[in-house]
């Protein structure tokens, strides 16, 4: 049916108060959950056949950088691949890709960001529940097993890629592919 703005505001306020009331009532259980959350996540990661995810694109290094930057803001460890690899129909180079190992305290967040969810038990969900993070960035990615995993150098601070004009100044025109996130700035 029709949802009015006052109804949605009232609904959000009621939900907020209900959440506060519930958190007070479940204080001990919530504290226990908090204490076990990260140790249990590491245990889950150890049992997961997916040992890492790799993502990146030599055609769009800026978007690759921005995704890496978001992951680092969430205390997710990143590495360069130990060697270039082909997986899931894409080639991931040591210069233009990142590897995200699953064996870290942010395992559950990593899993949620990289999993491909295509079916839902409930027909009501926010649109972001369907976003696979690399696909939302239009970046190729792949799951890696222990056999495929090869970690290179750890990346503390991803570096923003620098573009350049190749071939010198032209008197007539420039020809380039509009692949990168900032390619429109050259137009």
Locate the predicted segments by residue:
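Intrinsic-disorder/low-complexity accessory segments
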Residues: 1-187
């Amino acid at each position: 049916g029709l949802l009015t703005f006052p109804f949605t505001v009232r609904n959000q306020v009621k939900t907020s108060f209900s959440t506060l009331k519930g958190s007070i009532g479940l204080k001990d259980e919530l504290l226990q959950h908090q204490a076990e959350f990260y140790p249990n996540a590491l245990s889950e990661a150890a049992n997961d056949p997916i040992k890492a995810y790799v993502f990146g694109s030599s055609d769009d290094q800026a978007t690759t950088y921005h995704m890496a930057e978001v992951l680092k803001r969430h205390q997710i460890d990143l590495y360069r691949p130990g060697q270039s690899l082909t997986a899931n129909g894409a080639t991931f180079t040591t210069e233009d890709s990142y590897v995200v190992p699953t064996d870290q305290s942010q395992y559950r967040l990593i899993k949620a960001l990289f999993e491909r969810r295509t079916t839902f038990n409930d027909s009501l969900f926010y649109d972001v529940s369907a976003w696979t993070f690399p696909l939302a960035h239009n970046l190729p990615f792949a799951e890696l097993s222990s056999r495929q995993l090869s970690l290179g150098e750890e990346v503390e601070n991803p570096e923003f890629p620098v573009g350049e004009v190749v071939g010198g100044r032209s008197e007539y025109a420039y020809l380039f592919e509009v692949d990168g996130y900032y390619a429109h700035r050259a137009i």
